[in-house]
Amino acid sequence: MQLVLAAKYIGAAIATIGLLGAGIGIAIVFAALINGTSRNPSLRNTLFPFAILGFALSEATGLFCLMISFLLLYGV
């Protein structure tokens, strides 16, 4: 029984590593937005929706990793 519990904890810890990638992805998206806006301020209204889309996709992958981690911990 202890081995199964330890495997659950290790699996959940490994699944949360994906949150690191989501955080880095969000930082890259907004760094590119700031860089693009500083180079050409008139494109701000064009670039912002693409940045929000990139943010949403990056955050979704992080939430999927978190969901898998919770399923490993509290699932059957």
From Swiss-Prot:
Question: Which source organism does the UniProt entry give?
Answer: Wickerhamomyces canadensis (Yeast)
Q: Mind listing the UniProt keywords for this protein, alphabetically?
A: CF(0), Hydrogen ion transport, Ion transport, Lipid-binding, Membrane, Mitochondrion, Transmembrane, Transmembrane helix, Transport
Task: Give the UniProt entry's GO cellular component terms.
Answer: mitochondrial membrane; proton-transporting ATP synthase complex; proton-transporting two-sector ATPase complex, proton-transporting domain
Q: What does this protein do?
A: Mitochondrial membrane ATP synthase (F(1)F(0) ATP synthase or Complex V) produces ATP from ADP in the presence of a proton gradient across the membrane which is generated by electron transport complexes of the respiratory chain. F-type ATPases consist of two structural domains, F(1) - containing the extramembraneous catalytic core and F(0) - containing the membrane proton channel, linked together by a central stalk and a peripheral stalk. During catalysis, ATP synthesis in the catalytic domain of F(1) is coupled via a rotary mechanism of the central stalk subunits to proton translocation.
Sequence intervals crossing the membrane:
14-34, 52-72
Secretion signal span: none
Q: How does the record classify its membrane topology?
A: Multi-pass membrane protein
State the compartments where it is located.
Mitochondrion membrane
Q: Does the keyword Ion transport apply?
A: yes
GO biological process, alphabetically ordered: proton motive force-driven ATP synthesis
Cross-referenced InterPro entries: ATP_synth_F0_csu (IPR000454), ATP_synth_F0_csu_DDCD_BS (IPR020537), ATP_synth_F0_csu_sf (IPR038662), ATPase_proteolipid_c-like_dom (IPR002379), F/V-ATP_Csub_sf (IPR035921)
Q: Which family does it belong to?
A: Belongs to the ATPase C chain family.
- Give the SUPFAM superfamilies listed for this entry: F1F0 ATP synthase subunit C (SSF81333)
- Keyword check for rRNA processing: no
Q: What is the name attached to this protein's record?
A: ATP synthase subunit 9, mitochondrial
